[in-house]
């Protein structure tokens, strides 16, 4: 008989955990990773790459950990440190820096499809702030994911609800995305039929979907209730703005459940039959029945099951993703399909990484620290794996910067290291609009709450008066418009602080930033359009002509010093003798420092992570 899991027993099993490990307890794991890879390389008659120089290491680790190149001062600080473990010290410093939060937000933004707007439901700034807070506090990955899956309430007061509201109109797609993103479970086919290649069946899929059956995802186009409420005192635009953070919510709905579809074609269930929730397993045993006296707990049961230490897929999925982040290719590709672990390039390595993730209690920083301290990470890059062969990690794979790394590095050249501390936070503008009272979420019945809503709105306006007409100041005081139409220095912020995503014509999108319509959609392929933008774009011209590095170079007294500074800041190295001769000759022929900066920014050495 299938095993029965109760709500209380599952909770009890999940709270039994070991004490948090202190930094350094898992550093021996770095050597174990190296040993696993060396053994695999020998098995395939391959050799590890040579160690990287300090210059190569510092540029690589800055890009991989905080998403930008190092400044000249940061270079000086590193080389002034005479300690033997200065690389490890730098890794620790970067993992705890504000830049790491910014870089990880970009990485998760692509994975979680983070957008400013979810199809007319309004801004999702509370989600941005919530996610950045989790990263800043180094919230364990399992707890972060749990919070997104069990979140309830209004978007304006609980930013974590935005994850489920993202696909509110497509609950089955939402489950598919969740299982694919967090478990590497390729279940898309199973929505309509048994998977032709994996062990997933359509019944399995619906049994998992039923954990969300009692949850209502209310994603309302607030233009309709705004029309219902509108009168001469308040413009439609202001009403839409006011209602958006209040009418988007995740709630339990009594009596709601999941049924098999009317066209269900298999013999193991009947069309229209009520689905009994069951957990899928990967141990060869049958799915486990779930019993609970309160259907409201089903979503929590699912979240705790999915993120449990005993579920190897959850740990392996995020470990595989982080490995790809640092090495350019995952142990098991694609990262969205771990259904056949034996197909991984190195199954033993993937299992070890999954166990390591559990051992560090899903501490993402600590896991990254272990990877970054491996000899494997600190070896020279391979340009490309042999054609038709698996990449076996003699070192990282040579790869282009992501769009966000390129943008943030150029913004650094423009403004300096202060960019790591420049933050935008528009969540308070949403939070102040949350109604402090219950109201009808029914578009037709909301008219009964008109006076309560208007009385509350009056308290938000500085002069106590309602703005008249569509041109009124509005409750956001134009903040949403200002954020999209950034100009001059206000636009030179890190990618994490700009609208998510940027418009298609912006540097970031042309360079490969994800549209955030599907997960993991960012591109590092490059192309003619990106090359033309780097050569002729307005932002490149700004860096060439008005940036801090150009001004700093101009203050140097000799051409040699000027050229050396440009090389250190753009390429993280000193110019070679031939480089110096060519640059001096160019200056003597009438070119200036901005031309040298242009050449460096358009070099392969700048755009590739070596």
Language-model features: locations:
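Short, structured secondary-structure elements
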Residues: 22-240, 244-247, 314-354, 364, ...
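Active-site-adjacent "gating/activation" loops or surface patches in catalytic cores
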Residues: 252-320, 324-336
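Bacterial N-terminal signal peptides
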Residues: 6-17
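Alpha-helical support elements that line or immediately flank enzyme active sites
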Residues: 309, 353-357
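Conserved micro-motifs of the catalytic ATP-binding
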Residues: 572
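Positively charged n-region of N-terminal signal peptides that target proteins for export
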Residues: 1-5
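Charge-rich, low-complexity intrinsically disordered and helical linker regions
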Residues: 459, 474-477
């Amino acid at each position: 008989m299938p095993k029965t899991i109760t709500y209380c027993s599952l909770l009890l099993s999940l709270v039994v955990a070991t004490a948090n490990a202190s930094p350094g307890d898992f550093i021996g794991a770095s050597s174990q990773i190296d040993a696993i890879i060396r053994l695999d390389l020998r098995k395939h008659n391959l050799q590890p790459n040579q160690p990287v120089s300090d210059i190569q290491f510092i540029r690589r680790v800055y890009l991989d950990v905080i998403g930008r190149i190092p400044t000249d001062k940061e270079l000086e600080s590193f080389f002034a440190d005479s300690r033997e473990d200065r690389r490890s010290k730098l890794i620790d410093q970067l993992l705890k820096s504000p830049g790491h939060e910014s870089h990880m937000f970009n990485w998760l933004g692509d994975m979680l499809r983070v957008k400013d707007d979810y199809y007319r439901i309004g801004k999702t700034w509370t989600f941005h702030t919530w996610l950045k807070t989790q990263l800043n506090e180094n919230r364990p990955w399992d707890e972060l994911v749990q919070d997104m899956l069990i979140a309830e309430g209004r978007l304006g007061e609980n930013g974590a609800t935005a994850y489920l509201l993202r696909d509110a109109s497509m609950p089955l797609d939402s489950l598919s995305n969740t299982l694919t993103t967090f478990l590497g479970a390729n279940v898309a086919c199973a929505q309509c039929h048994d998977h032709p290649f994996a062990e997933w069946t359509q019944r399995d899929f619906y049994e998992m979907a039923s954990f969300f059956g009692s949850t209502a995802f209310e994603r309302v186009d607030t233009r309709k209730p705004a029309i219902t409420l509108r009168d001469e005192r308040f413009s439609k635009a202001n009403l839409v703005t006011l209602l958006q953070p209040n009418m988007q919510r995740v709630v339990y709905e009594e009596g709601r459940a999941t049924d098999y579809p009317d066209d269900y074609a298999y013999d193991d269930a009947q069309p229209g039959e009520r689905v009994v929730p069951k957990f899928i397993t990967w141990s060869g045993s049958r799915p486990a029945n779930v019993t609970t006296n309160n259907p409201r707990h089903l979503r929590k049961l699912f979240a705790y099951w999915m993120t449990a230490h005993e579920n190897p897929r959850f740990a392996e999925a995020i470990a595989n993703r982080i490995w790809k982040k640092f090495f350019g290719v995952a142990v098991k590709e694609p990262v969205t399909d771990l259904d056949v672990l034996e197909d991984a390039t190195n199954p033993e390595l993937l299992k070890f990484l999954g166990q390591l993730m559990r051992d560090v209690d899903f501490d993402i920083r600590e896991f990254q620290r272990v990877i970054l301290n491996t000899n494997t990470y600190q070896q020279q890059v391979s340009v490309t794996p042999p054609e038709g062969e698996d990449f076996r990690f003699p070192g990282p794979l040579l790869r282009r910067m992501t769009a966000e790394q390129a943008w943030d590095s150029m913004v650094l050249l423009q403004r300096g290291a202060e960019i790591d501390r420049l933050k935008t936070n528009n969540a308070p503008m949403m939070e102040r609009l949350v109604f402090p009272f219950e109201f009808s979420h029914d578009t037709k019945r909301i008219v009964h709450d008109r006076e309560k809503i208007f009385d509350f709105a009056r308290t938000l306006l500085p002069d106590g008066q309602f703005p008249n007409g569509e041109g009124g100041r509005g409750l956001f005081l134009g903040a949403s418009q200002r954020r999209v139409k950034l100009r001059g220095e206000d636009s030179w912020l890190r990618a994490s602080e700009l609208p998510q995503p940027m418009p298609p014509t912006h540097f970031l999108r042309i360079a490969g930033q994800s549209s955030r319509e599907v997960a993991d959609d960012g591109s590092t392929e490059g192309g003619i359009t990106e090359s033309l933008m780097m050569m002729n774009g307005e932002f490149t011209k700004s860096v060439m002509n008005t940036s801090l590095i150009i001004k700093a170079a101009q203050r140097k007294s000799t051409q040699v010093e000027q050229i050396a500074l440009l090389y250190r800041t753009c390429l993280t190295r000193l110019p070679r003798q031939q480089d110096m001769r060519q640059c001096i000759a160019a200056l003597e022929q009438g070119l200036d420092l901005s031309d040298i900066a242009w050449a460096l920014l358009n070099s392969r050495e700048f755009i590739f992570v070596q």
